[in-house]
Amino acid sequence: MPNIFKILLIVLLAVVSFRLSASTGDKKTANDGSGNNSSAGIGTKIKRIVTAGLLFTSLATGGAEAIGRSNAQGGNAAGLVPSHLTNRSMAPPPPPAQFEKGAATRVEKMRAQLRELAEKMTDKDPKRLSPSGPDPHHH
């Protein structure tokens, strides 16, 4: 079971990093000289991606915890495992507590990284809008 969530988290990280690397190319042409910023929306796009990532990871941990709990009771969460496998008396039940702790800390680390990333992006936004132009607060 934990492998599914590892794969999902890796895919999520790959998507986020790909989108970030794709959007950094615009920074060179962000300021067109007249003070108009052609790529002002990048920061908000990144924020949206990060919040989507946070939503996704919280859903993933919720699912992981549900599966861990129902496996402890000998049940089958959302029919992910065929019943003839779960009902076998030979198969020892997985250790759900250990798995839940592992998944939770892993996702917490990821959430922290995403939050830091979001903060970095929001810090850069005002400086990037007019690096050589007048102070953005004085219009």
Curated annotation (Swiss-Prot):
Keywords: Apoplast, Coiled coil, Differentiation, Glycoprotein, Host cytoplasm, Secreted, Signal. One of its GO terms (cellular component) is host cell cytoplasm. A motif (CLE) lies at residues 128-139. GO terms for biological process: cell differentiation. The keyword Flavoprotein does not apply. Residues 100-125 form a coiled coil. Residues 23-90 are annotated as: Required for secretion from the host cytoplasm to the host apoplasm. Residues 66-139 are annotated as: Disordered. Glycans are attached at residues 37, 87. Highly expressed exclusively within the dorsal esophageal gland cell during syncytium formation in host plants (at protein level). Residues 106-128 have a biased composition (Basic and acidic residues). Residues 1-22 form the signal peptide. It is found in: Secreted; Host cytoplasm; Host extracellular space; Secreted, Extracellular space, Apoplast. Failed to trigger CLE-like cell fate regulation in Arabidopsis thaliana, a non-host plant. Mimics host plant CLE extracellular signal peptides that regulate cell fate. May play a role in the differentiation or division of feeding cells (syncytia) induced in plant roots during infection. Belongs to the CLV3/ESR signal peptide family. This is CLAVATA3/ESR (CLE)-related protein 1.
